[in-house]
């Protein structure tokens, strides 16, 4: 095979793959595809310098990764507002009509899988990032390349983010679980969990075996170049992605409802799990003008399918103890399948809820589950009672430590700070992402450390040694070193993270940041009146903080000595042009972005990750891209780095 013949054969193989994996319309037999595939592999092994990066043979890497890197989306991946019935749909559409009486809409299926953001530059796939928190996700490019329905190259030279859902067909999901059962591995709960787990494999060869599909649903960066969302969908298909099924262009509420009815009627027959329909204002310019709330875009919503109801029997009630000591009753159910997931437990929330609904042990109960939502018990089927049902009694003593419980409003609490369950939950929270972010210290590891008496409180984490860890089952030197390094890496962490990590009731991430910026280390010595002076703090938060500081004075002092959190008191300059303004940064700047953000925050600015009509300034560097274009289209003031520095130093 000559080099020219090789490139021709690669194009033929790509066409075969596209028709088989994307269009589901094979143009060659499996034998023909495999034969050509192996011919190309042999040529590439003999001529590695001539390999075409877009060849289907290059989708699976040879070397597994050790961990996932973080990656920032060019445009934020937002959550959508939910509507659940026709009345709520009408209310949502009427809000759009107030601004745009002639508005039209694009409707598409809401796939039940794992969201993925694909970045293409100069027509090449350069990164694939999970949704994460919407701003930053995990880089899974090596796995995305194994998904045959994701093009490695597209005929589009501008920078663009193609977004979609990674899914597994219902039939393929059954085969995966059958294989796992034969290998004595734990089963996936549903196709969504299987897709998400497959996407996060460190070894791409495992991902490649899972028959993942990519179903596109939108565009991030680059959307501003289109006039219509419907047009954008058609462009995505022309670029080589899977056609969007049940795509509808709707001009009225009635046509939206009709599209929903069609989709709902096909829900069970369609090979991929669906959990609703996405409704999007079609005109892109109108989308930009409507903008976003703190959580979601104003121009789109998810019209969810009704929650699936099933009945099951309450076999017993177990009690969970949280880090704040609150006892949560959990119903242990006779297993029942709902939407492809086996449900055997459902929260009962609290004992007041049990009394209000008159739920009893042995009751047949109605359970609902919608999408990712934790299963809920709606009501008992009273007519089916046969006299064997028993009242669910409130506990008087902690199920873990045996201490007497306190009844506080609707909650029942264990007050023993040394209770095993409270200690374990508090350490899990302490190590979590929004707290000290100790990589590798998750729930299973914390329980293992506690059961082996290596930790009895948060402080004990910092006394762990590699020698101790190596005595535990499943631990090797590299893993032990990584955990000790991650723990030591928390020394000097930002004060707000330290406050949040303590798990003070009613004091979350936002409150922790305010306290750290305003009071510094004095936060642990505050009077009630001082806390109440902070904007947004009520009596419940203030009492909780004062009581926690008093009860844990020694522990806080010891942790401060070990961790030495970084104190950054924020002195606001309210005379600056950026005071109380919303700023977006884009492009490559000469100074570290964190330094510029800190400087802007010291001037009272609010930093945003996306451009909308509420943005006051966009500060841009080299290769600014779509955010700068969007700002210019909305007539937002834009400043290059030199202009920004001149303004901020006035």
Swiss-Prot record:
<feature type="active site" description="N6-AMP-lysine intermediate">
    <location>
        <position position="110"/>
    </location>
</feature>
<protein>
    <recommendedName>
        <fullName>DNA ligase</fullName>
        <ecNumber>6.5.1.2</ecNumber>
    </recommendedName>
</protein>
<feature type="binding site">
    <location>
        <position position="414"/>
    </location>
    <ligand>
        <name>Zn(2+)</name>
    </ligand>
</feature>
<keyword id="KW-0436">Ligase</keyword>
<feature type="binding site">
    <location>
        <begin position="30"/>
        <end position="34"/>
    </location>
    <ligand>
        <name>NAD(+)</name>
    </ligand>
</feature>
<dbReference type="InterPro" id="IPR013839">
    <property type="entry name" value="DNAligase_adenylation"/>
</dbReference>
<feature type="binding site">
    <location>
        <position position="401"/>
    </location>
    <ligand>
        <name>Zn(2+)</name>
    </ligand>
</feature>
<feature type="binding site">
    <location>
        <position position="165"/>
    </location>
    <ligand>
        <name>NAD(+)</name>
    </ligand>
</feature>
<dbReference type="Pfam" id="PF03120">
    <property type="entry name" value="DNA_ligase_OB"/>
</dbReference>
<dbReference type="GO" id="GO:0003911">
    <property type="term" value="F:DNA ligase (NAD+) activity"/>
</dbReference>
<feature type="binding site">
    <location>
        <position position="419"/>
    </location>
    <ligand>
        <name>Zn(2+)</name>
    </ligand>
</feature>
<dbReference type="InterPro" id="IPR018239">
    <property type="entry name" value="DNA_ligase_AS"/>
</dbReference>
<dbReference type="GO" id="GO:0006260">
    <property type="term" value="P:DNA replication"/>
</dbReference>
<dbReference type="InterPro" id="IPR001679">
    <property type="entry name" value="DNA_ligase"/>
</dbReference>
<keyword id="KW-0862">Zinc</keyword>
<keyword id="KW-0234">DNA repair</keyword>
<feature type="binding site">
    <location>
        <position position="131"/>
    </location>
    <ligand>
        <name>NAD(+)</name>
    </ligand>
</feature>
<dbReference type="GO" id="GO:0005829">
    <property type="term" value="C:cytosol"/>
</dbReference>
<dbReference type="Pfam" id="PF00533">
    <property type="entry name" value="BRCT"/>
</dbReference>
<keyword id="KW-0479">Metal-binding</keyword>
<comment type="similarity">
    <text>Belongs to the NAD-dependent DNA ligase family. LigA subfamily.</text>
</comment>
<feature type="binding site">
    <location>
        <begin position="79"/>
        <end position="80"/>
    </location>
    <ligand>
        <name>NAD(+)</name>
    </ligand>
</feature>
<dbReference type="InterPro" id="IPR004150">
    <property type="entry name" value="NAD_DNA_ligase_OB"/>
</dbReference>
<keyword id="KW-0235">DNA replication</keyword>
<dbReference type="InterPro" id="IPR041663">
    <property type="entry name" value="DisA/LigA_HHH"/>
</dbReference>
<dbReference type="GO" id="GO:0006281">
    <property type="term" value="P:DNA repair"/>
</dbReference>
<keyword id="KW-0464">Manganese</keyword>
<dbReference type="GO" id="GO:0046872">
    <property type="term" value="F:metal ion binding"/>
</dbReference>
<dbReference type="Pfam" id="PF01653">
    <property type="entry name" value="DNA_ligase_aden"/>
</dbReference>
<dbReference type="InterPro" id="IPR036420">
    <property type="entry name" value="BRCT_dom_sf"/>
</dbReference>
<keyword id="KW-0520">NAD</keyword>
<feature type="binding site">
    <location>
        <position position="304"/>
    </location>
    <ligand>
        <name>NAD(+)</name>
    </ligand>
</feature>
<comment type="function">
    <text>DNA ligase that catalyzes the formation of phosphodiester linkages between 5'-phosphoryl and 3'-hydroxyl groups in double-stranded DNA using NAD as a coenzyme and as the energy source for the reaction. It is essential for DNA replication and repair of damaged DNA.</text>
</comment>
<keyword id="KW-0460">Magnesium</keyword>
<feature type="domain" description="BRCT">
    <location>
        <begin position="573"/>
        <end position="650"/>
    </location>
</feature>
<dbReference type="InterPro" id="IPR012340">
    <property type="entry name" value="NA-bd_OB-fold"/>
</dbReference>
<dbReference type="Pfam" id="PF12826">
    <property type="entry name" value="HHH_2"/>
</dbReference>
<keyword id="KW-0227">DNA damage</keyword>
<dbReference type="InterPro" id="IPR001357">
    <property type="entry name" value="BRCT_dom"/>
</dbReference>
<feature type="binding site">
    <location>
        <position position="398"/>
    </location>
    <ligand>
        <name>Zn(2+)</name>
    </ligand>
</feature>
<dbReference type="InterPro" id="IPR010994">
    <property type="entry name" value="RuvA_2-like"/>
</dbReference>
<dbReference type="InterPro" id="IPR013840">
    <property type="entry name" value="DNAligase_N"/>
</dbReference>
């Amino acid at each position: 095979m000559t080099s020219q013949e090789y490139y021709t054969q690669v194009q033929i193989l790509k066409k075969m793959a596209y028709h088989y994996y994307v269009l589901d319309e094979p143009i060659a037999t499996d034998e023909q595809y495999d034969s050509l595939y192996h011919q190309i592999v042999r040529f590439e092994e003999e001529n590695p310098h001539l390999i075409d990066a877009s060849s289907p043979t290059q989708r699976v890497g040879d070397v597994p990764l050790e961990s996932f890197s973080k990656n920032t989306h060019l445009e934020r991946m937002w959550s959508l507002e939910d509507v659940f019935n026709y009345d709520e749909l009408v209310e949502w559409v009427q809000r759009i009509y107030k601004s745009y009486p002639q508005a039209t809409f694009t409707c598409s299926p809401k796939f039940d899988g794992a969201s993925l953001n694909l970045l293409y530059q100069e027509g090449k796939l350069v990164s694939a990032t999970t949704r994460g928190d919407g701003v930053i996700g995990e880089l899974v490019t090596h796995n995305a390349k194994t998904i045959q329905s994701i093009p490695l190259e597209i005929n589009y030279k501008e920078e663009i983010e193609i977004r979609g859902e990674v899914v597994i067909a219902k039939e393929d999901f059954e085969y995966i679980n059958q294989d796992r059962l034969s290998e004595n591995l734990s089963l996936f709960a549903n196709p969504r969990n299987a897709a998400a787990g497959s996407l996060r494999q460190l070894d791409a060869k495992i991902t490649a075996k899972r028959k993942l599909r990519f179903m596109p649903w939108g565009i991030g960066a680059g959307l501003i170049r289109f006039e219509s969302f419907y047009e954008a969908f058609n462009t995505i298909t022309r670029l080589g992605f899977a056609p969007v099924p049940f795509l509808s262009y709707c001009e009225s509420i009635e046509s939206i409802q009709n599209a929903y009815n069609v989709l709902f009627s096909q829900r069970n027959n369609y090979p991929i799990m669906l959990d609703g329909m996405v409704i999007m204002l079609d005109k892109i310019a109108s989308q930009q003008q409507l903008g976003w709330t703190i959580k979601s875009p104003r121009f789109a919503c998810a019209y969810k399918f009704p929650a699936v109801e099933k009945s099951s029997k309450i076999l017993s009630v177990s009690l969970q103890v949280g880090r704040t000591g609150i006892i949560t009753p959990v119903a242990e159910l006779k297993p029942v399948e709902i939407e492809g997931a086996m449900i055997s437990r459902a929260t009962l929330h609290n004992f007041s809820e049990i009394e209000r609904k008159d739920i009893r042990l042995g009751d047949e109960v109605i359970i609902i589950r919608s999408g990712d939502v934790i299963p809920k018990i709606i009501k008992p089927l009273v007519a089916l009672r046969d006299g064997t049902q028993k009242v669910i009694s409130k506990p008087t003593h902690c199920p873990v430590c045996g201490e007497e419980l306190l009844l506080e409003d609707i909650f029942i609490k264990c007050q023993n700070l040394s209770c095993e369950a409270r200690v374990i939950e508090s350490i899990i929270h302490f190590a979590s992402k929004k707290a000290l972010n100790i990589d590798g210290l998750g729930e299973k590891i914390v329980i293992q450390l506690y059961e082996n008496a290596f930790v009895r409180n948060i402080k004990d984490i910092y006394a762990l040694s590699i020698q101790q860890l190596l005595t535990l089952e499943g631990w090797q030197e590299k893993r032990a070193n990584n955990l000790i390094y991650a723990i030591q890496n928390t020394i000097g962490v930002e004060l707000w993270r330290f406050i949040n990590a303590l798990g003070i009731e009613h004091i979350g991430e936002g409150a922790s940041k305010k306290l750290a910026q305003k009071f510094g280390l004095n936060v642990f010595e505050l009077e009630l009146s001082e806390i109440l002076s902070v904007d947004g703090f009520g009596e419940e938060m203030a009492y909780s903080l004062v009581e926690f500081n008093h009860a844990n004075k020694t522990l806080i002092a010891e942790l401060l000595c070990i961790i030495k959190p970084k104190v950054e008191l924020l002195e606001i300059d309210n005379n600056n042009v950026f005071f109380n303004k919303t700023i977006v940064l884009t492009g490559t700047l000469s100074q570290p972005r964190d330094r510029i953000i800190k400087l802007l925050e010291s001037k009272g600015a609010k930093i945003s990750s996306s451009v909308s009509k509420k943005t006051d300034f966009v500060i841009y560097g080299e290769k600014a891209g779509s955010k700068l274009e969007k700002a210019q289209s909305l007539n937002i003031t834009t400043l290059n780095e030199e202009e920004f520095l001149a303004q901020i130093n006035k």
